[in-house]
């Protein structure tokens, strides 16, 4: 299992457009991919789940990836989060 904590830095938070890009990036991977806050957890392959987290600027979350392609999935998602300026 690979995990990393992130803090949302985008002033708009993770709203519909970046959430859909994260879901699109996560969906092809076989690994289980989850985002957890202190209060909630969501499957990163579910747009409704990600939107339900209501991640605003300053929110902290942890990315969990577990499965046969976890290394590739984790790298792709962590890179997308940072390159889009969503989280660090």
Swiss-Prot record:
Ranges for domain HPr: 1-88
Subcellular location, record wording: Cytoplasm
Q: Which SUPFAM superfamilies match?
A: HPr-like (SSF55594)
Q: Which residues does this entry mark as bearing Phosphoserine?
A: 46
Can the keyword Transcription regulation be found in this entry's annotation? yes
- Activity regulation statement: Phosphorylation on Ser-46 inhibits the phosphoryl transfer from enzyme I to HPr.
Sorted alphabetically, which PROSITE patterns does this protein's record hold?
PTS_HPR_DOM, PTS_HPR_HIS, PTS_HPR_SER
Determine if Lyase is one of this entry's keywords. no
Identify the catalytic residues.
Answer: 15
Task: Write down a Pfam family by its short name.
Answer: PTS-HPr
Cellular component GO terms, alphabetical? cytoplasm
Protein family: Belongs to the HPr family.
| Protein role | General (non sugar-specific) component of the phosphoenolpyruvate-dependent sugar phosphotransferase system (sugar PTS). This major carbohydrate active-transport system catalyzes the phosphorylation of incoming sugar substrates concomitantly with their translocation across the cell membrane. The phosphoryl group from phosphoenolpyruvate (PEP) is transferred to the phosphoryl carrier protein HPr by enzyme I. Phospho-HPr then transfers it to the PTS EIIA domain.
Q: What is this protein called?
A: Phosphocarrier protein HPr
Record the organism.
Lysinibacillus sphaericus (Bacillus sphaericus)
This protein's encoding gene: ptsH
């Amino acid at each position: 299992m690979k995990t990393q904590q992130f803090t949302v830095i985008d002033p708009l938070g993770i709203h519909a457009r970046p959430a859909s890009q994260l879901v699109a990036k996560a969906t092809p991977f076989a690994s289980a991919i989850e985002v957890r806050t202190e209060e909630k957890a969501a499957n990163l392959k579910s747009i409704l789940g990600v939107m339900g987290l209501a991640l605003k600027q300053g929110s902290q979350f942890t990315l969990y990836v577990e499965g046969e392609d976890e290394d590739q999935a984790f790298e792709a998602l962590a890179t997308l989060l940072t390159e889009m300026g969503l989280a660090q």
